């Protein structure tokens, strides 16, 4: 798996877009070193919110 794009949201929150060896796209939502993987961007954003990220208070950097 390789990272295509990373978005840092501050306070340890980040979202990586990954591509697998077979060409499939995945997402990795992280808070510090705790990460969850998803095949869908919407689900990955829900994971970030579940980890405590508030999209109304933080802008991507």
Label every model-predicted segment.
Residues 1-28, 35, 60:
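Short N-terminal "domain-start" leader segments
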Residues 26-57:
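A short, charged, amphipathic alpha-helix used as a generic interaction element across diverse proteins
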